[in-house]
Design a protein with these regions (language model features):
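Glycosyltransferase specificity loop/lid
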Residues: 1-444
């Protein structure tokens, strides 16, 4: 390593979306010659090895997840258990504090990056190490959601001083935020909002995968609120895939004309209720466009096949696939036949979509997803959101069809605006030198 090289420890939340996001930023640091020590659950390393692009600089440090009563043996990440057990994983992660302290004393890094371990800043400070709360969600989401409110209705609108924006929540979304923030015990006897506010208040800086051109006002709001630097890594674009699209999907997509296929994916953990699962795919059928939906089986079903509406498979056999397994999302999004991406609005998925040419249909569910949807659909005007019921949060097949047609059909005025805005943002994000400039500042 050079004289100016940094030693950085990464300790992300035990969820695959967080682990891969932290590894992505680790690859960027390694490109600049910095050394990374990446702490993760033992058996999870094999799932991440292929994404470590600089194994000579990024060293995985596997640790054993402490046993907590109620957790099945062998549990390591949120992918191993249903949502109600997540708090037990958080408790297990808190129990790793002595192990983390020992590692920090041994490694003597300049910085430690973390997200959910609210106790890490105080530990790092005692050891003379700077801590960075690296957020896997957007600055807009943190600015809107990180507040301790007494009632759900407070989340219908933004907090005082929030920048002018289209961002607000519907009643069903506000209730969901209130439940996560103030009702659901979030491990070790702490509420989610308490843990997140402590992490933000105690760290030395907060880091984001974003840029000023897209979210500058929200970063300024956060700097004033938490009185510390907001460091931006830039868009942190997905690495060019080293693999090729599976022949099965390449062959299937190749049979359709350019920009004609709907692709739908809701991430590795999201599961719909059966009736909403059926409304979604029936909406795709109504559009008349070919579609590929990569979805987990709905709640209560073992497979996607058993949850298909009666006669659906026969009616759509020539132009539709509902797949219950993992797919190469980044490669599918870049395929020339794909014209529309129906997304749950996870920040990582939106980042991948913004640098591709497919248009966005926004169907958020929980957490930061509604904020991301309003940012993309309202402030940036790069997507169309599927309408939902204000109280119950339910969508219909007709709502899905209408949103898809708005972005896909050439004679749609809204679609023309969306396509123009998306093209402008894509050109900006791919501009030569943009990401490198941001990341140089991030490292300094």
């Amino acid at each position: 390593m050079g004289e100016n090289s940094l030693k950085i420890v990464m300790y992300p939340w035990f969820a695959m979306g967080h682990l891969t996001t932290f590894l992505h930023i680790s690859n960027k640091f390694a490109e600049k010659g910095h050394q990374i020590f990446f702490i993760l659950p033992t058996k999870t390393q094999s799932k991440l090895d292929q994404f470590n692009l600089h194994p000579h600089l990024i060293k995985f440090i596997p640790i054993t997840v402490p046993h907590v009563h109620g957790l099945p043996d062998g549990t390591e990440t949120t992918a191993d258990v249903p949502f109600p057990m997540y708090s037990l994983i958080r408790h297990a992660m808190d129990l790793t504090e002595p192990v983390i302290e020992s590692l920090l004393r041994e490694l003597k890094p300049h910085f430690v990056f973390f997200d959910f371990t609210h106790w890490l800043p105080a530990l790092a400070r005692r050891l003379g190490i700077k801590s960075v709360h690296y957020c896997t969600i957007s600055p807009a989401s943190v600015a809107y959601l990180f507040r301790d409110e007494p009632a759900a209705d407070a989340f219908l609108g933004p907090p005082p001083g929030f920048p002018p924006s289209a961002i607000s929540l519907h009643k069903h979304e506000a209730r969901g935020v209130d439940w996560i923030n103030n009702v659901k015990e979030f491990g070790s006897g702490m509420k989610f909002v308490q843990r997140m506010l402590m992490a933000a208040e105690e760290c030395d800086a907060m880091g984001f995968k974003s840029c000023n051109e897209m979210e500058g006002p929200f970063c300024e709001f956060l700097e004033k609120k938490f009185k510390k630097p907001m460091i931006l890594a830039g868009p942190v674009l997905p690495e060019p895939p080293t693999s090729t699209l599976d022949e099965k999907w390449a062959k299937w997509l190749d049979q359709f004309k350019a920009k004609s296929v709907i692709f739908c994916s809701f991430g590795s953990e999201a599961r719909l209720e059966r009736d909403q699962f059926q409304e979604l795919i029936l909406g795709f059928e109504l559009t008349g466009f070919p579609f590929l939906a990569a979805l987990k089986p709905p709640i209560g079903a073992e497979t996607v096949e058993e949850a298909l509406p009666e006669g659906f498979r026969e009616r759509t056999a020539e132009r539709g696939v509902v797949h219950g397994g993992w797919v190469q999302q980044q490669l599918i999004l870049s395929h020339p036949s794909v014209g529309c991406f129906v997304t749950h609005c996870g920040w990582g998925s939106l980042s991948e979509a913004m640098v591709n040419e497919c248009q966005l249909v926004l169907l958020p569910d929980v957490g930061d997803q509604p904020i991301n949807a309003r940012l993309m659909g309202g402030d940036l005007r790069v997507g169309v959101e599927v309408e939902k019921g204000e109280e119950d949060g339910l969508f219909t097949r007709e709502g899905v069809m209408n949103a898809v047609r708005l972005v896909m059909e050439d004679d749609s005025e809204i679609g023309k605006e969306i396509r123009t805005k998306h093209s402008e943002w894509r050109e900006f994000l791919l501009r030569e030198g943009l990401e490198s400039s941001y990341f140089d500042d991030f490292c300094s």
